[in-house]
Amino acid sequence: MKKDTSELKIHYKSLKKEIKQRLRQFSALPAPDYFYELCFCLLTPQSNAKKCWQAVEKLKKCRLEGRKINSRRIKSCLRQNTRFYRKKAKYIKEAVKKWHLIKEKITKIKDAAELRNWLADKDNVKGLGYKEASHFLRNIGKSQNKAAILDRHILRNLKRYGVVREIPNLNKKNYLLIEKKMIDFSIKLGIPLDELDLLLWAKETGNVFK
């Protein structure tokens, strides 16, 4: 069933300038900061995004790149700010080890869908699924309006607006199917996918963040 989207369009009009500014900030992110955006996206599952960013700020002070990896130090940065910090510390440790390869792929693979597929492969980056890989690409300005971040805020709104009937388990097949529906929805609204994601997130949380 189609739902009225007039209120959403009004909300977009009020936030459009801020949303576009945030996306410009993502696109202008210096390459050395990509690593910490990856850390952020590894931390966010089942955790508060702003608290996760506080943990990332602590990680930045540790300057993990190029250093001997100190698991205890990583855990201490995460403990107060994210759930399942022990497991996520392991993911970050692995990301440090593989960062040279990850950087190379970000540079070489120009298509967002292809790059996300590589990032979401657990043999390449542990702890990243399709949602987290999409989030990472958006936050470094490389999602090309092709990668939906299907978190609980977005999924609730897609159901609310009749884009999906129910919220299924997000295996790869279902993720790509719902993503296609969200892209079609964004086209009908006249709102680019990356902007729609930030709009729906702001609608749920009250602010345009990451």
Predicted features along the sequence, with ranges:
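C-terminal accessory module of base-excision DNA glycosylases/AP lyases that mediates lesion recognition
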Residues: M1-A28, A89, I106-N117, N124-K210
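Structure-specific DNA junction-binding interface
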Residues: M1-C62, K68-S76, Q80-T82, F209
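Conserved aromatic-histidine-acidic binding/catalytic patches
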Residues: A31, F40, T44-S47, Q80, ...
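Non-catalytic, well-ordered alpha-helical scaffold segments
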Residues: D33-C41, W53, R86-K93, K131-S134, ...
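Short, hydrophobic/amphipathic alpha-helical patches that form generic packing surfaces
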Residues: E37-Q46, K93-K97, R138, D197-K203
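Short helix-capping and hinge/turn segments at secondary-structure transitions, especially at repeat
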Residues: N48, L64, K97-E104, R138-K142, ...
